[in-house]
Amino acid sequence: MGSFSITHWLILLVVVVVVFGTSKLRNAGKDLGGAVKGFKEAVKDENTEHAKKHVVLDHDAGTNPPNITGTQSDTTSANKVDDTHNV
């Protein structure tokens, strides 16, 4: 009762072809296929960009990171303050 038999599907197909015509259905199929192809290419491009970023990050991880603690600049600014008080 809940599922359709093959005859119901064939009748539905005939009604759709009569209402929309074969040319509109063919164009809709081409458009749908193009959209799916574009989506797959976008996902593929996103995956390759993501993989390239990981390669670059892994390559950078092997080098010594720069000293970004700021201790050198803090000592020079402290020396400048001390120099002004000593004068």
Swiss-Prot record:
One of the record's GO molecular function terms: protein transmembrane transporter activity
Pfam families: TatA_B_E (PF02416)
GO cellular component terms attached to this protein's record: TAT protein transport complex
Location in or out of the cell: Cell inner membrane
Record field: compositional bias (Polar residues): 64-79
InterPro entries (UniProt xref): TatA/B/E, TatA/E
Keywords recorded for this protein, A-Z: Cell inner membrane, Cell membrane, Membrane, Protein transport, Translocation, Transmembrane, Transmembrane helix, Transport
Membrane topology: Single-pass membrane protein
Any one of the GO BP annotations: protein transport by the Tat complex
Residues passing through the membrane, by range: 1-21
Cell inner membrane is among the record's keywords: yes
Keyword ATP-binding attached: no
Region (Disordered): 56-87
HAMAP family attached to this UniProt entry: TatA_E (MF_00236)
Family label: Belongs to the TatA/E family.
Oligomer and partners: The Tat system comprises two distinct complexes: a TatABC complex, containing multiple copies of TatA, TatB and TatC subunits, and a separate TatA complex, containing only TatA subunits. Substrates initially bind to the TatABC complex, which probably triggers association of the separate TatA complex to form the active translocon.
Stated role: Part of the twin-arginine translocation (Tat) system that transports large folded proteins containing a characteristic twin-arginine motif in their signal peptide across membranes. TatA could form the protein-conducting channel of the Tat system.
Protein name per its UniProtKB record: Sec-independent protein translocase protein TatA
Lineage: Bacteria, Pseudomonadati, Pseudomonadota, Gammaproteobacteria, Moraxellales
Gene label: tatA
